[in-house]
């Protein structure tokens, strides 16, 4: 009989949101209260850092931008990160795995993300980036900046996930609110981090440790991450289908994946046939030569729900693949059902001249909602 395995030590997982878009994504995760992960926000914009819910922040390029944004100039973002490499190295050092979140096409995220990724790789850290591409209406120049930034970032990360903002309109429909649309994109990062963190930090019937995760994700290039949750008699099949649909991710063909990591999260009622159903779904799209790792995480709070998180890596190593999406009528509903916000009070800040995290003024839930719903600033932050 299988017994839950108690882990003696946990891998150190950190998430770094860079610029306005990356900061928004990490704030979304903070509200979701994901355990076993440290969160950091990095920005040239001092005002944005003062307003963020993220508990640990690093201001970069203060002598270059004077505390303002990068002005949609990636070179300014790059130089700002180069100026404060020591402060960035401090927040990365000691981590086993780092997720980098950024909106590409603006200044801070586009320019600083590759620098931060390079620091992480030099420290021997497993580095995964999840980035957004700008809307077409934002202009050709911003899209070119985004492509250049993604190309540079890909040189310094183990795995790279790309979320095109234009898919928000195509997948979620024109009637979706702006707040919910960007929340859907933020959910991609949240589910990826949560799924991997739970594999490593939660006891399970089938144990997966950090070495397994590193095998699947190290030096793999383009990747896909998806998560689905369902309940009822067919919950295993349905959640697996939703997970591999990933409608908000860059168009990908999963059949060439070189590595597949799967986390099944459920209560103590998880059945053997459900485990088999998820495994069959994974085998249906992965190649015979792929390294497949499947683990379970036990969470009594799931009740009769079952969640499947899939990480497929090494996709299109020679060229970017053509579209091959699995459609599912319930996937949009599940994305929307996962929305929800919780607010934290604790806030700290760290700058080049102050490596100790100092407390700053607490904000109320109403203040945070007002900041987040201020549309012009929100659009500016998402792009920068």
Swiss-Prot record:
- Please classify the protein's predominant subcellular localization into one broad category: cytoplasm
The identity of this protein, by name, is Cell division protein FtsZ
Q: Which UniProt keywords apply?
A: Cell cycle, Cell division, Cytoplasm, GTP-binding, Nucleotide-binding, Septation
Q: Localized where?
A: Cytoplasm
Question: In the UniProt record, does the keyword Transcription regulation occur?
Answer: no
Name the gene behind this protein.
ftsZ
One Pfam assignment? FtsZ_C
Origin species: Wigglesworthia glossinidia brevipalpis
> What superkingdom heads the lineage?
Bacteria
GO MF, one term, reads: GTP binding
Q: How does it assemble?
A: Homodimer. Polymerizes to form a dynamic ring structure in a strictly GTP-dependent manner. Interacts directly with several other division proteins.
């Amino acid at each position: 009989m299988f017994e839950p395995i108690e882990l003696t030590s946990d891998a150190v997982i950190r998430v770094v949101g860079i610029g306005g878009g990356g900061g928004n994504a990490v704030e979304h995760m903070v509200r979701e209260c994901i355990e076993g992960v440290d969160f950091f926000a990095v920005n040239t914009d001092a005002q944005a850092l003062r307003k963020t819910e993220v508990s640990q922040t690093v201001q970069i390029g203060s002598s270059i931008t004077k505390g303002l944004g990068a002005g949609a100039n990636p070179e300014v973002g790059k130089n700002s990160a180069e100026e404060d490499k020591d402060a960035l190295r401090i927040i990365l050092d000691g981590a086993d795995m780092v997720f980098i979140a950024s909106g590409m096409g603006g200044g801070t995220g586009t320019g600083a993300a590759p620098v931060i990724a390079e620091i992480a790789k030099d420290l021997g850290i497993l580095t995964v980036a999840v980035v957004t591409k700008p809307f077409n209406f934002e202009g050709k120049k911003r899209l070119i900046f985004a492509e250049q930034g993604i190309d540079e970032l890909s040189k310094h990360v183990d795995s790279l996930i790309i979320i095109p903002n234009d898919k928000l309109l195509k997948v979620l429909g024109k009637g979706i609110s702006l707040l919910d649309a960007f929340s859907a994109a933020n959910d991609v990062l949240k589910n990826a981090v949560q799924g991997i963190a739970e594999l490593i930090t939660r006891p399970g019937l089938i144990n997966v440790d950090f070495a397994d995760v590193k095998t699947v994700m190290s030096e793999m290039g383009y990747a896909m991450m998806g998560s689905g949750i369902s309940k009822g008699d067919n919950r295993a099949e349905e959640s697996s289908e939703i997970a591999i649909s990933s409608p908000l991710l860059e168009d990908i063909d999963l059949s060439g994946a070189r590595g597949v990591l799967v986390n099944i999260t459920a209560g103590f009622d998880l059945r053997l046939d459900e485990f088999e159903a998820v495994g069959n779904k994974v085998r249906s799209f992965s190649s015979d030569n792929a390294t497949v790792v499947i683990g379970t995480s036990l969470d009594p709070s799931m009740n009769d729900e079952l969640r499947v998180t899939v990480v497929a890596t090494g996709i299109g190593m020679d060229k970017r693949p053509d579209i091959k999406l699995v459609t599912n009528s319930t996937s949009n509903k599940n994305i929307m059902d996962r929305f929800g916000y919780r607010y934290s009070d604790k806030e700290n800040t760290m700058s080049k001249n102050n490596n100790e995290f100092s407390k700053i003024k607490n904000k109320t839930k109403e203040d945070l909602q007002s900041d987040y719903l201020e549309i012009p600033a929100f659009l500016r932050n998402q792009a920068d």
